[in-house]
Amino acid sequence: MPFNAFGRYVGLMKLVCSQAELNAALQLVSRAVASRPTHPVLANVLLAADAGTGRLSLTGFDLSLGIQTALDASVEISGAITLPAKLLGEIVSRLASDSPINFLSDEAGEQIELTSSSGSYQMRGMPADDFPDLPLVESGTALKVNPAALVKALKGTLFASSSDEAKQLLTGVHLRFDGQSME
C-alpha cells in the first residue's frame, strides 16, 4: 500500500466494522469537528484503516482540539479518507446495530460506498492528504493516573465548566500534577 509524504495511506480502502463501535467512535471524535470550519476539510472526520493492525482510526480536529480513537475492524485493504462528520454520523446512527458495516473507497480516496443490511450509501469525501496532522507532544512527562480517581476529580469540577463556546477558556478544567498527587 503506498504512503504519502506524511506517512498516511493513499488509494483504495476496504474494511468491515461493527456499527455500534463505529457509532460510539464517531460520537466521540465529532466533538472535535468544527461546526463552522475555516477550511472545508475541518468539517470532516479522518478515517484511516490499517490491515497490519486490524484497526480503523478516526480523527476529528478543529485546529485547536483534536480527538483520535480507534476500533477493531476487519481491514482487507489499508487506506484513508476524510468524510463529512455530521452526515456520516447521521447515517451510521440509523443503521442496524447488529449489522456489520462494509466500507469500500475509490482509488483516489475521495468517494466511499458504505453498505450494511439496512442499505447502501455513497458519500463523497476529501483526500486524507488534505486533513491536518494532529500536533505531537515533543517534550513532557508521561504519567499514570488511577481512572477512578480521575473520574471522581472530574465529577467534582465539571459542573463549574462553561458550555458556552464563546467563552472557550472556561469550557475546560485545569489539572495539575506534582508527581505524587493530582489537583
Where in the sequence are the language-model features?
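Structural preference for solvent-exposed beta-strand-turn elements
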Residues: 1-183
